[in-house]
Amino acid sequence: MQWTAASCDQHDQHDPPAVNRNSIEQRTPANNCEVDPMDATGSTKHPHLPKQREADRPVSGSGGGSSSLTLSGAVTTSMEVTVSTTTTTTIIESSSSTNTTLEKNSPSPAGGSCSSGSGSLSPAYLQHHLQHHGSPLHHLQVHHHTAPPSPLAAVRSAQMGSSVANGAGPAAACLAVCCSPGSSHHHLGHVGHLATGHPLPHQLPHQLPHPSLYPLMAAAQLGYAGSSGPSSLVNSPALGRRKRYTSNSSNCSSQFNNNYAGLDVDSLDDMLRKLTELEQRVIEAEERAEEAEDKVRAMEQRLSEWPKPPPQQAQHPHSHSHPHQPIPSHPQEQQAKNHCSPSHQASGGATAGAAGSGLPPTQETEKTITSLEIQVEEQRQLRLHDARQIEAKAAKIKEWVNNKLRDLEEQNQLLREQNVKCNQQLELLKNHIANQSQRHSIVGPVRNSLSLDVQDFTGSGSNPEHRRRSESLDPQEIIGRPLTSSYPHHQHRRNLSMEPQELERNLVAAVDGLTLAPLSSISNKAPGGVPTESGVVTRPDSSDTDTAHDYAEIYTPSCEKLPAWMKNNPALMASGGNSSTTTTTTSELGVPRPPTPPLHRFPSWEAKIYQVANDGLAGAGTGTSTAESTASQEPDIQDGMGTNLSNGRRHGHGHGSGTGIGTGDGHGTLGSTPGTPLPPSRQQQTASGGFCDISVPVYATVKGRASQIRSMPFTGDSSDDSSDGEDHAVMLTHHSHNSSSTDNTETSTSGSASSPSKSLKTSSSLSPAKRSGSESPKNAKARVHIQSRTSTTPSSRINQHLQPSQHQHHTLSNQNHGHQLGAYTVTPSSGQLSLPRYHANALQPGSLPSPLQHMRGTVISDLSFESGLSDDYALPPDAVSESTCMDASMPSLLMRQSYVDSPSKKIESLEKMGHLAKLGGKLKTWRKRWFVLKNGSLNYWKSQHDVQRKPQGQIQLDEVCRINRAEGASTFEIDTGKKVYYLTADSHATMDDWIRVLQNVQRRNATKLLLSRDDQKPTVQGWVTKVKNGHPKKCWCVLLGKMFLYFKAPAETNPLGQINMRDARVEEVEHVSDSDSEEREDAAQDQARLTVAIYPAHQGPTYLILSGKPERDNWLYHLTVVSGGGPSAGTQYEQLVQKLMETDGDPNCVLWRHPILLHTKDTITAPLSSMHTETMQPEAIKLFKSIQLFMSVAVNQPGIDYHVVLAQNALQHALDMPELQTEMICILIKQTSRHLGQKLSVGVQVNKKLGKQTRQLLLCATQSLFTCDTQQAGHAQANGSSPTSIQAPSATPIIDCKSNPPVYSFVQGWQLLALAVSLFVPRSSRLLWYLKLHLSRNADTKTETGKYAAYCERALERTLKNGGRETKPSRMEVLSILLKNPYHHSLPHAIPVHMMNSTYQVVSFDGSTTIEEFQATLAHELGTRDATNGFCLFSDDPIEKDLEHYLEPLAKLCDVISKWETALREKGSGKFENSRVIQLSYKNRLYWKHTIKCETDKERLLLCYQTNSQIVQGRFPLSRELALELASLMSQIDMGDYSLEKSRDVGVGLKGLDKFYPYRYRDALGAEQLKDVQELLVSKWMLLKGRSTLDCVRIYLTCCRKWPYFGACLFQAKPRQSPESNTASGATPVAWLAVAEDALNVLELSTMAPVARYPYSSVMTFGGCQDDFMLVVSHDDGGGGEQKLLFAMSKPKILEITLLIADYMNALGHTVPGTPQMNSLTRNGSHRSLRTSQRPNLGGGSAVATGFSTNATTTAHNTLNSHATHTLNSNHSHTLSSSHHAGGGSQPGTLSSGHHQHHHIQQHHQPDILKSTPDHQRIK
């Protein structure tokens, strides 16, 4: 925005001054030529530049007409008037600078005063201006006045000069100018505008100075002379510059005004105001800087002219300055002012005196002048330096401001475009509403989805910006809520990170109150392919293409909002019947166009393959791949108006003879082909339940994260419904059905009888179901109670079908309130009744209109009204807003006082009340309830006001009740045995309070029950004085089992307290207690009393004061028996271990030779460790015998299975009974401890220097202490050993004692110990210490047993790190330990892992290796990414051939193998099948679109083979031609170039067809056709000769990724429907459930066309429900409510799809390393992992952190759909750009591993696992 006058002197070109960074005005960086204003002395006024030399200044009159002036918008220094100047320009301008009065006491001849800046105007001038020039017409005439210069200008100049000289002032001169004929003084006003920095719209042409500005120049000169003195009029060096300045100003203003009248001033007001403010700040800053410069320059000039001082300079230069001087802008200026002013004044006074007396200057004066000159020179240099710095800063600021203004201008332009588009949309919307309101006929049936592929038709069709995606908007959304504007980039509204809120509010306000009817169905398409409706959407050849675009953005219905897709989709109905349904085809459901062609050129052969992929993939292009034969085989579907819409399916051209998807060449649909078997029956599911009991968990969504709320499916019984008879007015008509209603003859036995309580394995976080949106339920759309729980009459159940075409308006009268409900509609896609927002609180069932009686099979979702007093639906804990209720921020506010007023004694609170959210209802939604805990029971009401009524439910807290809390969520569960209540608090603090009080009540209730039982007799009881913390109290004390209880009285059932004696220590003390004032009731107690002290583990001591010795002895004896503390506690074996601990494991201690600690051949008579029950003692003795039997018989190679079974049974016995685990470790330690003997001497000699205590210790030992020969260490004292030590001299050789068994017995004992320490460790810390000490004492690399001991040390550390095991060791594990010493290998076991390309990799592991660790090792050896590639491990099923099981990351691999072997034996033939072992495979499970560029070559190769497996099995929609192209690529990848040797093999082509061609195409071919296809495959294969494997892999994946659902894991499922909604045939067809990374999609079985889509953000609950898969979704589009969907699937598939959805949801909130950040839905750390003490996190694994492979089920073996491909579907509009990856950067040879290894591994050719453990396989 520049404008230029005639020309400008080059000496005046300077950079603009610095401006504020916050300014937003725009300036032009180039050619900033500005004129600097002059001060009284003619110096430049630029604050940031050095003073201009006198020689460089222009002389008077030098500013001719050739000077040019350029203004750059913001900085207009040249148009300003500084403090000491007054021009006509600034007199007229009235808004920019401050009002400053100059020279109040001016001695000018004019005698008047004038104002600087623009603050004060002459009233006479203003009146004259308004009277004569007020009309806009005059403005227009003056602005265009371009008269040439007139001779009258000189006359006016003379008149104005005389008027100023006579004292009239500049205002009179201005009036003279205004009144002169032909003058255009309005230029002056606009010059004032320019002085404020107002920008001009565009560059103006060059013009001569206007004649009216010549007198203005003269007036400016006269005004300046009047203010500065008469001499300055003639001699001022600034006169010429001031003329040029004034002329340039007038010229610029003339150009501006000639073009300014044509602009819209209102549109620029905003920008002008901002620029004015910025200019004001600039002017103020410059004024301050110029004030300081003026003083310095004036001083400098006076000093330079000192020898010839004029008479005028005797006056002080500062006499006329403004009284209020601004502070200089720099410290140097202030310093110069302060430093120079006094000296200057002194020298000035002396000079004046000398001049008056006529004497010459003295020497002192010369010195003063010299010093002043030096100081002035220093100040000049400082100013120069500062000017350079300021100039550099100003340049940077200028550049930043320019860039900022440029960006803002671009944003403004974009907003203007959006505004235009929104206005067009609004007009279109109004027109459409007007057209709809004019129609009074019945609207046709609403289409479930409408796809509008509209282009701009401007020749840039390939540009993705011009391609409109198939947006979707449900008619329910249009009806039920105000419309919002579409984002101009045509993205789906769920993908928007920010919406233009202001535009949205404008659009809502514009259409507020308007009701929009649903769209009419479109019966046919226009010739151009664009659907037409009522003339609103035009054809492509129409000129109004923008209208079509806007209409497509607003009125595209959604397949995403189709909760009743199974009712409205004809492809999923067995027969159409009389129901009015519409068709949903591939093209109509928004299948996008092919991706944009790449920027680089492909080779012709590669481009041809991509073209085939575009045409041959169903859904990859515009839908042309669906063959006509497919459409011809399907029945014609009639819509509601009777129009045949089946021709909409015949919109493509075929390739070859019938390239339809799933046609099978006339042999039925895809579901009947051999490649896609239907789901097995329920009996087959039972038989193929896998090698573990399958229990499908249930998940709820909280903050975008899937949290497990149940470890087993919902059974539909009252036991898993925690509603307790609450109002069930909201029900789904098809929900509460039994599996017998559809499959009467089917049974299910697997996984349905397990306990409802969750085990430690699956105790993941419990969370409430997420409600979409953050608005309060009271602000949600009002719902109507349509159906009550008790009423079952047809009038109360809305199960009739309302015709979708009948969008009728009915009035529902509310009998209670007497007003009417507005118009309602029933959307056919969801079947939900839509009502106006605030109309009624209830709706009588009998008042429903007749059309609702025709709703058949329609899901009536949550339609209940929210009354003002009822807070039925609670806010989820994550949606608590700032207006949270008080109990959320103060969790203990309503809690009863927990402590009594006593300062020392605390009483636990047993009562509490407050709000909790409870999971209840058939939809399992969270409802807010008022809970009150009192008298040992938990009651709840609907609200706090209902406390006086009967409670809705009651929870008894007895001994069976279990209270479990969740990790990471404020949710806990109360399991009463019959029901499980899921409760959610508002915060973690509130939850902790509730759990603490509930546990206190439960503990108290359990004590009551314990005392009331007849079989629980107290061991001892009586009155005892208890002293605690110095406070005595007489209590009734009872010793019950190991619990010491004390009560107020014998009849009390609530104890005052309790002490667990298990870890307490009991001692007798001599009447010493910490009591300060013991109670004495009578004189008899004055005698000495006896005291027993109890020292609990983590508490202070408690003293019991007893009156007599017999009573004291009785209590002391019984308390000591039940206590667990002290050296004498426990068995004799444990006491010896305790004594060894006291000696710190001294190897010379005599206790090591105690026979109880050493091996024995006899059977023990009592357990070695403490048993809590007597029933476990016989089990311990049996365990000892089995171990003794294992060790006594030598291992024989032919009969090795004898030892395998013995070891497995003993270890399983210990796993089943945890108390036996410590016992087994003790037995193995004892049986592997040798008796040591010497050659010499018999008997025992004790050193004479032994002390008394040592002799007593030896004498107190058992008589059999020394049963083996020993010898005294006579040199013990001389060798520096302890005098109490008894040791054998090291020089004497040690031989085996006679009590030792054969050597093999010890070896086998160590082998069994090596197996045991990998399964469990002792629970007692004392015995764990002893085990570690035993291993370290026996570890020796030179002996066989020493090597086993060294391995046991490593295995023990691994078990302590990763936790224990679940099942017995497998046969493979036992054989690996028995047949070779594990010491030689850090990982003693190994197993092959099979890849999809028929290769395998042998990986080593140990007994504690988890699947996660094993997979990390495998990925390292294969060269793939670790944990981020989505690949997981799967195992085959021992029974079913095609069933595979997903292995959880935290499961132990040895447990997996053991369970597999157990299932093979138990569910198979029952015999040992030693020839079969488990087969592990490595496949992709989770596919991420954003990690494509991070894939390694090995991953892409494996993904190619996995995708090919899906294609061959018919799980990929492609044409015959594309199938041949992909088969040829796979042949090149798998077998290399087609050479002459291969051509001799006739079956090589047939082999390629068998491996890479779809079954459904190959099986229907005859012999001749098969030969032709084989030749065609060979010919395409030959064309790929010389192509590298990397190129073929890249092309193959690029072609396959063009399918929008590439990567979606496919599951076949049968939708469940209510009996009323079943079709005439009573059957519902099977569909595909495609699980992608962002949504669950429903596809047709035959065509794989999309039917419905449920994003994870709308999923509330999912998992098992009886024998079906349940999915509960919410509708946040204004339809309100939730919907429950059921799908019949096999149990393994239900488990797999549940875990897969949970893993995808939990991974959305994480960032994959090395990949871009996804939309974060959850907080950091969201992962479906185990958080139990038995399963600590592994330090080396990263899968737990990234969330790709997670654990969420009860069992360690989860099933997987063995035919599923795991890829991605991330865009809502199903567009997928083609990705091409260069093969560079990878290591050569990584893809060729499949060619150098064995390709075909049959089951009977499995590698020998026991021999495949080379030493080079290790952990790196």
From Swiss-Prot:
Keyword Lipoprotein attributed: no
Domain PH: 909-1003, 1017-1124
CDD domains noted in UniProt: FERM_B-lobe (cd14473), FERM_F1_Max1_like (cd17094), PH1_PLEKHH1_PLEKHH2 (cd13282)
Biased composition (Basic residues): 129-146
Gly residues composition-biased segments: 655-669
A GO BP entry: animal organ morphogenesis
Region annotation Disordered: where it falls in the sequence: 1-73, 86-158, 226-260, 286-366, 453-497, 519-548, 577-597, 619-689, 735-830, 1713-1748, 1764-1820
Biased composition range(s): Low complexity: 86-128, 247-259, 346-358, 623-632, 738-769, 1764-1781
GO cellular component: cell periphery; cytoskeleton
InterPro entries associated with the record: Band_41_domain, FERM/acyl-CoA-bd_prot_sf, FERM_2, FERM_central, FERM_domain, MyTH4_dom, MyTH4_dom_sf, PH-like_dom_sf
Every MyTH4 domain range: 1159-1378
Comp. bias intervals (Polar residues): 20-31, 453-463, 787-818, 1714-1724
Entry protein name: Uncharacterized protein CG43867
